[in-house]
């Protein structure tokens, strides 16, 4: 009977969980989810537990014009008796992404909250393949690991032409509809001006 919410900055993860959980016909499903900008005006300890996914994506301020509140991490910690942050600082994708382990620790100390740090051993979206993640960190020089060889389940290629990359991915997708082309988004690319040749 805890007052608990799943919190993310982006609505996409919330919508995926809502769609999956609706299969079980849970009532009041929308009441389990909140956006990260929902806590700027909350009283202290309004919630029992806030589970914050992708905490590295949190912004400093809330609202459409980033004009509400002081700091989303501070506001989440203030609003709940127990806050859980899932964070991977290597997955920040925009200049506004403010979530960091140090920021979380700073505001936890501000509220005299106990801090418990745990490491997840594997990622569901990679079928639990820690070897793949370690290999990727090593090849991209994110961190040095002992994984120099790629598991045979994966194929790794470097392309000089993005159109050729797209073509190969489209061909792979015809096999089992599980191939995607994705890219991080950091800032607007304007078709006029200095970035014109890149768009």
Model regions and ranges:
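Cofactor-binding loop segments of dinucleotide-utilizing enzymes, especially the Rossmann-like FAD-
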Residues: 9, 88, 186
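Conserved helicase/translocase motor-coupling segment
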Residues: 94-99, 113-134, 141-199
């Amino acid at each position: 009977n805890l007052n608990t919410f799943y919190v993310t900055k982006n609505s996409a993860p919330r919508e995926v969980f809502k769609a999956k959980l609706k299969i079980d016909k849970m009532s009041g499903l929308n009441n389990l989810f909140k956006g990260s900008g929902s806590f700027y005006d909350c009283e202290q300890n309004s919630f029992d537990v806030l589970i914050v996914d992708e905490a590295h994506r949190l912004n400093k301020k809330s609202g459409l014009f980033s004009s509400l509140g002081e700091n989303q991490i501070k506001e989440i910690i203030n609003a709940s008796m127990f806050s859980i942050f899932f964070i991977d600082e290597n997955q920040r994708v925009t200049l506004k992404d403010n979530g960091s382990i140090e920021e979380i620790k700073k505001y936890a100390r501000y509220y005299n909250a106990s801090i418990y740090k745990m490491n997840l051993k594997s990622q569901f979206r990679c079928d639990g393949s820690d070897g793949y993640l370690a290999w990727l960190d090593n090849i991209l020089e994110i961190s040095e690991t002992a994984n120099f060889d790629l598991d045979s389940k994966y194929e790794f290629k470097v392309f000089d032409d993005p159109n050729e990359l797209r073509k190969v991915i489209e061909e792979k997708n015809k096999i089992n509809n599980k191939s995607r082309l994705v890219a991080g988004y950091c800032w607007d690319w304007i078709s006029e001006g200095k970035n014109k040749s890149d768009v």
